[in-house]
UniProtKB/Swiss-Prot annotation:
Protein name: Cytochrome c
BP term (GO), one: mitochondrial electron transport, cytochrome c to oxygen
UniProt: heme c binding residues: C22, C25, H26, M88
Keywords: Acetylation, Electron transport, Heme, Iron, Metal-binding, Methylation, Mitochondrion, Respiratory chain, Transport
One cellular component (GO) term of this entry: mitochondrial intermembrane space
N-acetylalanine PTM positions: A1
Organism: Spinacia oleracea (Spinach)
Record bears the keyword Lyase: no
PROSITE patterns found in the cross-reference section: CYTC (PS51007)
Similarity annotation: Belongs to the cytochrome c family.
Length: 111
């Protein structure tokens, strides 16, 4: 399934998902430093493995994917399948609604 087939996302629900599943390793705050994972501010339209001053795996650099609703929707289903060798330990969000909600939050909070 693709993002175009996903249910509408709710950014408020997505914020809760981010807080419980992502915030341990990521921030979305402009100018904030990296945590265990890279700062996600400016994520949309950026190529994987290119946030300044973050030490990425070769897999993330070499994938060279441009982050969009479509690519994030697929990536967040199973990160290790989408980018074999990624350092991200998160197993993914299996429910389409959860992925749509998280993407709605990320679109709102990372620009």
């Amino acid at each position: 399934a693709t993002f175009s087939e996903a249910p509408p996302g709710n950014k408020d629900v997505g914020a809760k998902i981010f807080k419980t599943k992502c915030a341990q390793c990521h921030t979305v705050d402009l100018g904030a430093g990296h945590k265990q994972g890279p700062n996600l501010n400016g994520l949309f339209g950026r190529q994987s493995g290119t946030a300044a001053s973050y030490s990425y795996s070769a897999a993330n650099k070499n994938k060279a994917v441009i982050w969009s609703e479509d690519t994030l929707y697929e990536y967040l289903l199973n990160p290790k399948k989408y980018i074999p060798g990624t350092k991200m330990v998160f197993p993914g969000l299996k429910k389409p609604q959860d992925r749509a909600d998280l993407i709605a939050y990320l679109k709102d909070s990372t620009q």
